Amino acid sequence: MRVSSTEEESYHQGTASMSTAGAVDDDGARFTPAPPQTSLSVTEPARETPVHAVTQVLVVGGGPAGFAAALAARRAGASEVLLVERYNHLGGLSTGGLVIWIDRMTDWSGRLVIAGIGQELLERLPAHAVAGAPRELWGSTEEDPVAYWRERQGAFRDTVTWSPMIDPEWLKYLSQEMLIEAGVKFLLHSWVAEPLFDESERRLRGVTFESKEGRRAILAEQVIDATGDLDLCARAGLEFEADAKTGGSASLIA
């Protein structure tokens, strides 16, 4: 490894940090990497990276979006789906971050308006792993139920809603089981390092990732970026939409 500098300064080994912060412009999203904290640069030696797998669909990120994308892709007929997650569990912030409250899956009349895979998962959880208003109270405006569920984040605007809280450990387990049942393969403890970008077609063709086994690559026909900040698309220079006010972004197929 060679270290170079544009200034006369020495290189000291020690704790290093890397920022992946970016700026979102007012018109949409433009990834702007944070500037380095030094003028040093490192030249890494060229190397061949072994290909761990070749798959039809690769999903990067095992949070709620990545979980649903992988499951939906397999159910839609994809022959092979592989999901890569950096932590030791699925669920993202829902499980590891303890964001276990789902805000209003019903409208003010009590009609279920957010369903699909999310509701399927909730219905498969054991009763003791989900806390929320019973179905017969959804949309109720009666004083006593509203007062009771308001204290439990289940009633708003004097209306009882389906706003469940979920046991995060059960959510980890069931998410994994549902992927296994569907035939989705997944890698945990695997941090995606770089996108493999096809300049001629302007699309992602895979990724390199790091794990206990070192750096490897995955090649795919389709890549779904389900990272929290669309890290892959940003690094590849692809355009994407983001919410300038909240910094949120949507998953993207590239």
Q: Residue spans of the language-model regions?
A:
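Core beta-strand elements of the Rossmann-like FAD/NAD(P) dinucleotide-binding domain
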Residues: 53-55, 213-222
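The conserved SAM/SAH-binding core of class I Rossmann-like methyltransferase domains
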Residues: 60, 84-85
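Beta1/beta-strand and adjacent pyrophosphate-binding region of the FAD-binding site
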Residues: 52-63
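Conserved beta-strand-loop-beta-strand element in the redox core of flavoprotein oxidoreductases
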Residues: 196-217
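Conserved N-terminal/central alpha/beta ligand/cofactor-binding core
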Residues: 16, 22-31, 36, 46, ...
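Aromatic pocket-lining residues of Rossmann-like dinucleotide-binding sites
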Residues: 73
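Glycine-rich loop(s) and the adjacent beta-strand/alpha-helix scaffold that form part
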Residues: 225-254
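N-terminal Rossmann-fold NAD(P) dinucleotide-binding loop
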Residues: 66
